């Protein structure tokens, strides 16, 4: 079902289910023979959500070779390594920020992110998580049931990012006068282009000098290329649906002419360094994801680390 302006979701439907899919990939990466990451909360969270397709994938009952369309450029087999190196990128970002003295972090569209529970945060650290109310409530309750305890002062902010989240964040105790480490992981593609710009504007307005931002950006592409990407994704997920997958990924994202993230942030006073997914995979000794001449795929995603200097 296509997105609407005021749509909502839980972790089994729409955009929320993509968070469960990513957590499933993290669980598989964690259980690998030589794991690049250790997220012990990923698998129990996926099991608790209860989407059969993702549970079978995590347990190995789903054979990805039977599911994947190798010509589409979107394969389940590629996701554990891709999500592992993505996770390491954002983990390292937070570690670098705290070593620099930052004591306030904001995780935008936090989904099933368990960093507040699994990273070694310094004393005096406050972590804010922002997401849909149903998503926040589910994760908080499930992790409490697992006996998990946050390793920082965790403050959840149950608000849609299309609403007045800056006020909700401030009401939760956010200090705009202190440097902040922000992450927007797997978020921009699910925002309209103008909403992406507005999000970056709001982050900047709330950020003191020395604040840091890490984000995942989708390269801009002409409409024709976007349509090809959507068709390739539909081709891939058609095979998945034969095995119980119920999402239409092609309907979840937003197309349109997007600002170049690094240039947009530069105009706002941020200095950015970008790394492509292919480089992250190579740096971590993981198998490459082939580029697709007809479309943008995971291989083309860019990860930016930015510092506010203004």
Swiss-Prot record:
The keyword Ion transport is annotated on this UniProt entry: no
GO biological process terms, semicolon-separated: methylation
| Coiled-coil zones | none
InterPro entries (UniProt xref): Ppm1/Ppm2/Tcmp, SAM-dependent_MTases_sf, SAM_mthyl_Trfase_ML2640-like
Binding positions for S-adenosyl-L-methionine per the UniProt entry: 131, 160-161
One Pfam family this chain carries? Answer: LCM
Record GO terms (molecular function): methyltransferase activity
Q: Does the keyword Methyltransferase apply?
A: yes
Alphabetized, the UniProt keywords read: Methyltransferase, S-adenosyl-L-methionine, Transferase
- This entry's Enzyme Commission designation comes to 2.1.1.-
Which family, according to the similarity comment?
Belongs to the UPF0677 family.
Q: What does this protein do?
A: Exhibits S-adenosyl-L-methionine-dependent methyltransferase activity.
Q: What protein does this entry describe?
A: Putative S-adenosyl-L-methionine-dependent methyltransferase MMAR_3534
> Species name for this entry?
Mycobacterium marinum (strain ATCC BAA-535 / M)
């Amino acid at each position: 079902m296509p997105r609407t302006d005021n749509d909502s979701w839980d972790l089994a439907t729409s955009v929320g289910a993509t968070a469960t899919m990513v957590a499933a990939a993290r669980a598989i990466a964690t259980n690998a023979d030589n794991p690049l990451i250790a997220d012990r909360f990923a698998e129990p969270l996926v099991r608790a959500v209860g989407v059969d397709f993702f549970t079978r994938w995590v347990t190995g009952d789903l054979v990805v070779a039977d599911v994947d369309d190798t010509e589409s450029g979107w394969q389940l087999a590629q996701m554990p390594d891709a999500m592992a190196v993505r996770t390491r990128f954002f983990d390292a970002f937070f570690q670098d920020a705290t070593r620099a003295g930052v004591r306030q972090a904001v995780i935008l569209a936090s989904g099933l992110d368990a960093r507040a529970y699994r990273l070694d945060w310094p004393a005096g650290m406050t972590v804010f998580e922002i997401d849909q109310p149903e998503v926040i409530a589910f994760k908080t309750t499930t992790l409490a049931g697992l006996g998990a305890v946050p390793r920082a002062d965790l403050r959840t902010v149950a608000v849609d990012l299309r609403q007045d989240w800056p006020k909700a964040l401030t009401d939760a105790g956010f200090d705009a006068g202190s440097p902040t480490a922000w992450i927007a992981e797997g978020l921009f593609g699910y925002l309209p282009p103008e909403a992406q710009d507005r999000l970056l504007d709001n982050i900047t307005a709330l950020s003191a000098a020395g604040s840091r931002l890490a984000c995942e950006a989708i390269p801009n592409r002409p409409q024709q290329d976007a349509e090809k990407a959507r068709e390739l994704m539909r081709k891939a997920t058609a095979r998945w649906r034969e095995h119980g997958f119920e999402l239409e990924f092609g309907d979840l994202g937003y197309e349109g002419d997007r600002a170049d993230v690094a240039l947009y942030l530069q105009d706002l006073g941020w200095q950015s360094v970008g790394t492509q997914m292919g480089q992250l995979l190579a740096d971590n000794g993981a198998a490459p994801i082939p580029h697709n001449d007809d479309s943008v795929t995971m291989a083309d995603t860019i990860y930016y680390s930015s510092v506010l200097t203004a």
